[in-house]
Amino acid sequence: VRVQSLTLVAAGVALLAPAPLPAARPSPPVAVREGNVRAADLLAKVRDCVPVSKGRYRSDARSRAEIPVCGARGAVFWKADMDIDCDGRPGLLCNGRNDPLFSGTTAYQQSDGRYLSAETLPYVVVPTPSGIWDYRVHGIRGGSVVAVIYRDRVEYAVVGDTGPREIIGEASYATAKALGIRPGPHGGGTSSGVTYIAFKNSRVSPIEDHAAAVTVGERLARKFVRGG
């Protein structure tokens, strides 16, 4: 009888023991809303394009050159896709193991001399200056503030890297993640629907200060929406 009682007790304990949890699945990117200027209000100001580029860009190497850079009061803008830049300072996600095309450098560097971190810093990639367009002529440089708009989201980023001369539409892992876009270098990004508004003669220093980019970006976005 004693043995039977012990057996029943052991069975009861087993029933009360917590079941093993299922393996955790990677969580989807979570969009983060920054500032108070609405995406719709910004998009209303960039409906029409007055080209400032001398030609048009491709969204990738195989696509047709159909994307102009447009001028606006106090800004330039383009409407494109978003490819993912996972370059710069290596991290847990952006490194040579995860991305065979990984480059450990960015065109611009932090205040401490290190390259930017695509994982943690929202930044935009602009085309290397060419006969199509030279961003520097329009008051854009490393650290300039860019409002990146996707659906109803606005993310304030900085110009942080340069890319191919004939391709436009690229931003860092952190930018994509903040907008709810798949951020990985493989299968990440989106094929269309992204608007980039780069504010002329703006600059965040140090370039890695994202809070400052949000503050400056929000102020310039409000001014842009008001038409000034």
Regions inferred by a protein language model and the residue ranges of each:
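Soluble periplasmic/extracytoplasmic beta-strand elements of cell-envelope proteins
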Residues: 123-125, 158, 195-197
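Secretory targeting and sorting signals
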Residues: 1-26
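Short beta-strand-centered aromatic/proline hotspots
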Residues: 155-164
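Cell wall/extracellular polymer interaction/catalysis modules
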Residues: 25-153, 166, 178-186, 200-228
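Intrinsically disordered, low-complexity linker and terminal regions at domain boundaries
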Residues: 186-195
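Short, solvent-exposed secondary-structure boundary/capping segments
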Residues: 165-175
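Active-site-proximal structural scaffolding
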Residues: 8, 139, 168-169, 189
